[in-house]
């Protein structure tokens, strides 16, 4: 089923590995993470309002910074951000969901904000499997068995992976740009010239010049990505600066560069994730109820909805959000994204 929503007019908020745990995969300590004291910092939401207290918890390899808003006993939704963005993509989505009774958890991914590695010896790995393992470890640390997941960009890929490999942890899924699970083998195949052009930054990051350039010009680089990915989004300097603060994370550059080099097979992952990557390379179906979304002005590389629809074998709907909506759909069209979260369990 497909549905097209014009956010300029519609502003009403609507109401295998599947059986394996992290311990089974050799990540036994992840389920025994301990809470750390809450940080005093409070990320700022839209209009300067507080986006709830920023919390910290040890989970797996990380000490994760996250926002937790809404009733503590409400149904849980995890909202996962992409690159080069941060938790503030959901600054307007989270209050809408909290008002509807959801407990909303928005974590900084590894390499962003206040999320840090617990050991200096841990590889600053950005391969696709590791972010999914991070989030499952966070669920275990928070003692959350199941949740609704929403995401875009890296966050959508991470949510897709969890839904595909740990469906027992996922009630339902909202995924911007649909099915984003990939593999190194698939990424080695050349694309048509216009498609290759869209991935210019990936090829830049493959060089030492690119790594140095990103480190030296991180804010300017990421602001350019925002502009290219969402050409009709008139975000303010303050809006960008609010998210750019998360790029000060000491591991940000290393994680980002490794992510894009790993995709092309130019950097190795870690052996403990090989089995996960092997299963992901097979393109596993996603069986949980899913709404996929796309903005009509997404300037970033993304697949056409028809190309991935058959990957979702459970209850499924696609929504195209019109009105000049780009890549960062939750921040550009928060009501439409929240509406999808509220409806996905009732498909």
Report each predicted region and the residues it spans.
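Catalytic histidine-centered segment of alpha/beta-hydrolase-like enzymes
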Residues: 325-333
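Boundary at the C-terminal end of the N-terminal hydrophobic targeting segment
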Residues: 31-35
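Conserved acidic functional residues
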Residues: 82, 153, 331-332
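Flexible "cap/lid" subdomain of the alpha/beta-hydrolase fold that forms the substrate-access gate
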Residues: 36-52, 61-64, 69, 76, ...
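C-terminal segment of classical bacterial N-terminal signal peptides
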Residues: 22-30
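Conserved HGGG/HGGXW glycine-rich cap/lid loop of the alpha/beta-hydrolase fold
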Residues: 68-116
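N-terminal secretory signal peptides and thylakoid transit peptides that target proteins
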Residues: 2-20
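C-terminal alpha-helix
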Residues: 340-347
């Amino acid at each position: 089923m497909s549905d097209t929503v014009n956010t300029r007019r519609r502003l009403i908020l609507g109401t295998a590995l599947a059986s394996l745990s992290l311990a089974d995969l050799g990540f036994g300590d992840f389920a025994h993470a301990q809470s750390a004291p809450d940080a005093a910092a409070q990320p700022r939401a839209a209009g300067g309002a507080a986006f709830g207290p920023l919390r910290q918890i040890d989970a797996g390899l990380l000490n994760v910074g996250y926002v937790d808003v809404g009733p503590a006993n409400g149904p849980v939704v995890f909202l996962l951000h992409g690159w080069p963005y941060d938790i503030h993509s959901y600054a307007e989505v989270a209050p809408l969901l909290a008002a509807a009774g959801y407990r909303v958890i928005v974590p900084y991914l590894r390499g962003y904000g206040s999320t840090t590695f617990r050991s200096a010896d841990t590889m600053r790995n950005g391969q696709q499997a590791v972010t999914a393992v991070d989030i499952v470890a966070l669920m275990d640390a928070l003692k959350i068995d199941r949740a609704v997941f929403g995401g875009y960009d890296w966050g959508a890929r991470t949510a897709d992976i969890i839904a595909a490999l740990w469906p027992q942890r996922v009630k339902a899924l909202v995924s911007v740009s649909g099915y984003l699970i990939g593999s190194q083998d698939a990424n080695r195949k050349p694309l048509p010239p216009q498609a290759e052009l869209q991935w210019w930054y990936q090829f830049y990051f493959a060089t030492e010049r690119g790594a140095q350039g990103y480190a030296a010009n991180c804010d300017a680089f990421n602001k350019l990505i925002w502009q290219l990915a969402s050409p009709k989004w008139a975000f303010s300097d303050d809006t960008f600066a609010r998210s750019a603060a998360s790029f000060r994370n000491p591991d940000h550059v290393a994680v980002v560069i490794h992510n894009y080099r790993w995709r092309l097979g130019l950097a190795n992952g870690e052996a403990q994730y090989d089995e996960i990557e092997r299963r992901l390379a097979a393109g596993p179906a996603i069986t949980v109820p899913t709404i996929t979304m796309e903005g009509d002005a997404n300037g970033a590389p993304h697949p056409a909805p028809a190309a991935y629809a058959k990957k979702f074998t459970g209850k499924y709907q696609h929504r195209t959000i019109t009105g000049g909506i780009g890549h960062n759909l939750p921040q550009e069209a928060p009501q439409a994204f929240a509406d999808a979260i509220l409806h996905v369990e009732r498909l």
